[in-house]
Design a protein with these regions (language model features):
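N-terminal Lys/Arg-rich, disordered targeting/topogenic segments
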Residues: 1-9
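Acidic/proline-rich low-complexity IDRs
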Residues: 2-3, 45-47
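Hydrophobic membrane-insertion alpha-helices, especially the h-region
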Residues: 10-28
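Sec-dependent signal peptide cleavage junction
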Residues: 24-41
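N-proximal short alpha-helices
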Residues: 28, 89-90
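A cross-family detector of function-defining hotspots
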Residues: 35-40, 47-89, 99, 108-164
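N-terminal glycine/threonine-rich, aromatic-flanked beta-hairpin/loop signature
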Residues: 94-96
């Protein structure tokens, strides 16, 4: 009986040490993740988590989700806004093809990818996306935002900006 008690104590001690090391490792990885303040980023004068004014937008009936509704700009058809139904807050902005839509970080569709890095900095993760596209992904852990700049042949093709 005493031998069984000693073995259990060693097993419990070992499990405690392993779980402690895993927690420390996880916290270290989380702390060292790159983060950028994206709270001031605007696309077509729209910010995430602001109340949405749909006066210049038409409802996109092709995309249907339970908690969200999507709008397309009347003038810029490739500018799509994802809006939370309950609070009517902007939760996503997607821009494709329209080269004239403004961003406050001075990047447009068709610009060189170097312009993105010059204006937003080097705290990004590089990612491969389907059909030969690459992406620069900027994360804002404090505000729970993610800005993805998709590019092909060093030319910006798509801008996606989402919030939780």
């Amino acid at each position: 009986m005493i031998l069984l008690y000693i073995q259990n104590r060693w097993i419990i001690s070992f499990l405690f040490i392993v779980s402690s090391l895993l927690v420390v490792l996880g916290l270290t990885i989380y702390k060292n993740e790159k983060t950028v303040d994206l709270s001031d980023v605007e696309i077509n004068h729209l910010k995430l988590n602001e109340t949405f004014d749909n006066s210049e937008y038409s409802l996109n009936k092709h995309v249907k989700l339970d908690r969200y509704v999507f709008y397309n700009h009347n003038k810029y058809k490739n500018l799509t806004i994802k809006v939370k139904k309950k609070h009517h807050k902007i939760k996503g902005i997607i821009l494709v093809k329209d080269t004239v839509v403004n961003t406050n970080f001075d990047v447009h569709i068709g610009d060189q990818i170097d312009a993105v890095i010059d204006n937003l900095g080097y705290n990004y993760d590089k990612d491969k996306v389907g059909k030969g596209y690459d992406a620069l992904v900027y994360l804002d852990k404090d505000h729970h935002m993610k800005l993805s700049i998709l590019y092909k042949d060093n030319i910006v093709k798509r801008i996606e900006f989402f919030s939780r």
